[in-house]
Amino acid sequence: MGEPKIPTRPEALELLHRFNESDSLRKHAYAVEGVMRHMARKRGQDEEKWGIIGLIHDLDYEKFPSQHCVKTKELLEEHAWPAEYVRAAISHGWGICSNAEPQTDLEKALYAIDELTGLVVTTALIRPSKSVLDVQVKSVKNKWKDKRFAAGVNRSVIEKGATMLGVTLDELIDDTIKGMQEVAEAIGLKGNPA
């Protein structure tokens, strides 16, 4: 195992790709990374750290779905990731598959936006453009009310996360959209050519 070593993005990306072959899971990871980087910049935090943790937060989901978060902890520890990174990565599953309650702003942000990225993706995909570039807060809020729309998205987790962060739901949605717009091409939501 060795001494903890701060991972680089290329190392994190290689690990993500080794354990996740699914295009949709990889795109979700890129989306969460993009939002985490956006939020880190906005808050004057370490963008690289926030982004890397966003990138690998679902590391175990494809190969070990019944051990989600538990296996991520093991895998990251095997690769000598710092305990702070490991805890942050598994905190997004608090109350579902992890006992690590989000404490830091990084952890609270990851907890809040993980599910929200799914709602933004689904909102973008029903638009004629199929682009996140023209998704607005009001579009997501309109879909938010319809519990059948993106029914798998746990809206109560998103609301709880916004409260933990001390932001309004509108602000959280806006930050999520902006972060995803920054990585629109990587997540396949740049849209159809006009």
Model-inferred region functions:
Residues 13, 17, 30-37, 70-73, ...:
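Predominant activation on well-ordered alpha-helical scaffold segments within soluble catalytic domains
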Residues 43-149, 159:
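Divalent metal-dependent catalytic cores for phosphoryl transfer on phosphate-bearing substrates
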Residues 2, 34, 44, 51-54, ...:
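Residue-identity detector for glycine
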Residues 1-64:
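Acidic/His-rich, divalent-metal-binding segments that scaffold phosphate/diphosphate chemistry
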Residues 7, 11, 27-31, 67, ...:
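Conserved active-site and cofactor/substrate-binding residues in soluble primary-metabolism enzymes
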Residues 18-22, 103-106, 166:
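Active-site oxyanion-binding pockets that recognize sulfate/phosphate
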Residues 20, 132, 138-194:
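C-terminal binding/interaction regions
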